[in-house]
């Protein structure tokens, strides 16, 4: 294990970052995860095209059992979730946390080992899912042995990240660090529930647990990881400090305490208790709090008088700029005079989404993961 000595840092956009120098951050783990994630994204994208073709030509590849819809669809879902999104999130966490802590990654060897195990997991998922070995639960299709490997890899990832944070140079933690720590803890809870607790029950109880997992896989795994990426790269790319760190923390704790309880909305008017439906309706209104907080952050951040140069700088980074514009549009937190601008931005976002053959939400999520490539040279 390489010595984890503190490195000299400076502030870029109010975010501590290492001063350029030889071998400050090796980023070997980062490259392994991000390259793998991009590769899986392209491969699974081809799987998605095959599935889409089956809706037009139902007999397309229908004589080959490995390419039937019932096997291809779980491969596409799990490939995008674990191969692309979660793999990219882990790679970006390995990039962001050491820089926010002012130290090197606690163990580059452990990180590389985690990456190797993660690739073994993805390849095992391809073989088992195409072979018809699956549990038949949404987002939890992976056979139990493969799911156990996911747990082991996540423990390795969590140990490395938390050990890096424990040796940090700065006492106060930036909001991205909070979101990434939350992602690690929430993922452990959510994944164990969806992949193991569901096997201990049947019927309505199993369905309720499964949709709790499915719902929170989006809200407590990919959402906080995406927010961590945005809170890090947007201020850094624009070289402008975050508008209000306390506001971002309000969004963090709102997500932590509210989102987990609303998973049953997938079963509204279904065979679940009425009190559960009533309570989740009450809590669901607060799910918007993190988004509104983030949107207000970006709006205030973007409207500062000193931000004209930073806006031009952001405009030169397409994916960061689209992330800012998308957050404005989706949060609905823009001031009334900016409605005309928001409409133009919405049209731009919609045209980009149509060009990519998907919806704006997924486009935003993918752009957030690609931002590292465009902002690394800023």
Residue ranges of predicted features:
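Extramembrane terminal tails and long inter-domain/linker segments of multi-pass membrane proteins
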Residues: 1-30, 61-64, 301-308
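N-terminal juxtamembrane segment and adjoining first transmembrane helix
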Residues: 19-35, 167-175
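Helix-boundary and loop/linker segments of multi-pass membrane transporters
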Residues: 26, 71-73, 307-310, 349
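Hydrophobic cores of alpha-helical transmembrane segments in multi-pass integral membrane proteins
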Residues: 30-56, 69-103, 108-132, 144-164, ...
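Non-cytosolic membrane-interface motifs at loop->transmembrane helix junctions
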Residues: 136-147, 172-176, 205-213, 272-283, ...
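Hydrophobic, small-residue-rich membrane helices and short re-entrant helix-turn-helix hairpins
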Residues: 169-174, 206-210, 237-248, 275-276, ...
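Alpha-helical transmembrane segments
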Residues: 299-311, 345-346, 373-378
